[in-house]
Amino acid sequence: MRLRNGTFLTLLLFCLCAFLSLSWYAALSGQKGDVVDVYQREFLALRDRLHAAEQESLKRSKELNLVLDEIKRAVSERQALRDGDGNRTWGRLTEDPRLKPWNGSHRHVLHLPTVFHHLPHLLAKESSLQPAVRVGQGRTGVSVVMGIPSVRREVHSYLTDTLHSLISELSPQEKEDSVIVVLIAETDSQYTSAVTENIKALFPTEIHSGLLEVISPSPHFYPDFSRLRESFGDPKERVRWRTKQNLDYCFLMMYAQSKGIYYVQLEDDIVAKPNYLSTMKNFALQQPSEDWMILEFSQLGFIGKMFKSLDLSLIVEFILMFYRDKPIDWLLDHILWVKVCNPEKDAKHCDRQKANLRIRFKPSLFQHVGTHSSLAGKIQKLKDKDFGKQALRKEHVNPPAEVSTSLKTYQHFTLEKAYLREDFFWAFTPAAGDFIRFRFFQPLRLERFFFRSGNIEHPEDKLFNTSVEVLPFDNPQSDKEALQEGRTATLRYPRSPDGYLQIGSFYKGVAEGEVDPAFGPLEALRLSIQTDSPVWVILSEIFLKKAD
């Protein structure tokens, strides 16, 4: 009985231990299961984060590839321009779909600076960088491109006189190796159309050949000038004028940069010296180093400044960064300062360094002749002292004659000197009935005549409503048949009371034509003024060609 009870107790104790062991194991197994679940969840979360990081990395890699492609494109275009491929212009910038990513707001994209960052209003219109007017043949591949900005002036425009001077001093070879680009920097379509048509009428050959081009900016190119702040003591109107002027220069440079090797900045109120183009080109080619940035052919303002076309992008970008802040001549000097001046050195050292980039040619090749500035109400009589004396008329040999006039001569500018090609004739305001007469010492036959009034420095001093008249030599001993032929011919021409026959008249300050051989020998030629003139008069060129 006692043994049976002990066996029972032993069995009971064993079962209890087994139960406790199973319970402990079960509890321990349940705890381990919870830990495994935790680790599994963490591994899954880590895997998701790694996947997201991989996707973000791929996204950024694509965006960086876009940036790299844009940089490669810019480098290739610059190299293409260097190699002579000048077909791409800044005017096509808005047409490039690859530019669109830089115009939007992307969170993780590197934003490259473009013209739109400095002129964000251009994004409002796709045509903002396209010329509103473009006349010409689009010539490229030349040595020299000349840019002339022109704006409306209240008193007098010098543009056509400037073009006459520039074109007349070019040789046939130079006309084939250059382009003159006129920027009519106005948004009034009627005004730009009128100026364009006038240029086309006066220079049809140059337009057709590709020598001369006329452009004007889009009305959407300019920003709102009413928000400009005054600076350096300049009133708002002057700040607006100089700000717009900076943008005009940029537009011209952007248009011209792909057309040639060199770009020369000019103004619309200048006169040029003979052989100016070859002189500039040779001076550039003779530079011992390519480090130069500006070659100056005039000491005044922004006249006669030559740049390498490859440098125009840098210059335009710099001007656009500060176009609202300072005038163009200051900005040009700042570009040189940034490139070569050491802030730890003195001003003299800086000037020496800048002199290596900005090289002056003497004597000056261009003279400023305008007196009425493009800034309303401003009179400026700037003259380049290094220009020297310029022969403003072509050389001719006139037949011997006695010259006389009823006009009152101004100072030493006599009619005799003009006839002998020593100077021009300048007189006070003509009145109706005044005359200029050339009486030949011996009667002679004339083949043709040419008179030009006004000159590049005083283009408004012209002859208006003035006729050209000749007096035939009536010799009773002459051949009767020839005499009869001459009398018959004279019936076709208006005759004055004193026997002079009208054979021509002045148009836009010029009178030219051929002399009818039937007149025979002539005693005299006369310029007769028919009406009162509002201005003084200059006779800058006199050419009387004898018949062979």
Curated annotation (Swiss-Prot):
Entry EC number(s): 2.4.1.145
Organism listed in the record: Homo sapiens (Human)
Name the record gives this protein: Alpha-1,3-mannosyl-glycoprotein 4-beta-N-acetylglucosaminyltransferase B
A Gene Ontology term for the protein's cellular component: Golgi stack
Protein location: Golgi apparatus membrane
UniProt modification remark: N-glycosylated.
Glycosylation site positions: 87, 103
Residues in coiled coil: 36-83
